[in-house]
């Protein structure tokens, strides 16, 4: 089976004495919805940026493939990485919209890798492409704002516009880096519901880094947890316990849990045991 995302032995050092990523290996299947959990500085955002090909790993370190095509190997981007990136939608924490441009124009930017270069430079789109953008905005529930400046939208609406951009891009993999970090609870619910719906209806892999444990458990069947750049847990979100999360988050845990995770749940019928690695935070 070709994995939607495959990471093999990836390391990244920003300083000689500290690795942001430490020999990370994981596979994500097409159609999975996976949460990345971990305390601030654990490596979640860094991992997503490597998968997207925005940055490279240490020289001689690891390999990343998306849908079987190489993004980077041994610290060097693949020659055709631009083509691979065309299949990767990225939702940023800070929305990454141009406030002075209409919402529809921001959404159609998702097509730029698939249109002739001269049209991408001039931002000229066919009527059929504009309609596809309007359809994407309708899918996320903000088509009424299509021709307003992006700066007039609320934070939640701007994030939904960013999700619409991945739809017109026809992304096969969606990476979302803390997409609800600055949003109110209702906006957060709408954004996560949209990502979950896209995952279900389009069968694309969605990987979302989160700080909210309860949100991860509600929307993501699988969790990958990082600590100090290492994968310390990879398994069902339903199998997480408060003790595991206290070990993962340390002093932040009580603020994050809010009684959303049982102390020691028994595995529900049909819920597999954690796979690949076990929680061993004392050694991490």
From Swiss-Prot:
Domain of life of the native organism: Bacteria
Binding sites annotated in the UniProt record for ATP: 38-45
Localization, UniProt: Cell inner membrane
A Pfam family this chain is assigned to: ABC_tran
Gene Ontology CC entries for this record: plasma membrane
Disulfide bonds: none
Alphabetized GO MF terms: ABC-type phosphonate transporter activity; ATP binding; ATP hydrolysis activity
PROSITE patterns: ABC_TRANSPORTER_1, ABC_TRANSPORTER_2, PHNC
Catalysed reactions listed for this entry: phosphonate(out) + ATP + H2O = phosphonate(in) + ADP + phosphate + H(+)
Parts forming coiled coils: none
Main location: membrane
Xref: InterPro entries: AAA+_ATPase, ABC_transporter-like_ATP-bd, ABC_transporter-like_CS, ABC_transpr_PhnC, MetN_ABC_transporter-like, P-loop_NTPase
The ABC transporter domain, residue ranges: 5-253
EC id: 7.3.2.2
Keyword field: ATP-binding, Cell inner membrane, Cell membrane, Membrane, Nucleotide-binding, Phosphonate transport, Translocase, Transport
Topology in membrane: Peripheral membrane protein
Keyword match ATP-binding: yes
Task performed by this protein: Part of the ABC transporter complex PhnCDE involved in phosphonates import. Responsible for energy coupling to the transport system.
Family: Belongs to the ABC transporter superfamily. Phosphonates importer (TC 3.A.1.9.1) family.
Subunit composition and interactions: The complex is composed of two ATP-binding proteins (PhnC), two transmembrane proteins (PhnE) and a solute-binding protein (PhnD).
The protein's name in its UniProt record: Phosphonates import ATP-binding protein PhnC 1
Species the sequence originates in: Cupriavidus metallidurans (strain ATCC 43123 / DSM 2839 / NBRC 102507 / CH34)
Gene (name only): phnC1
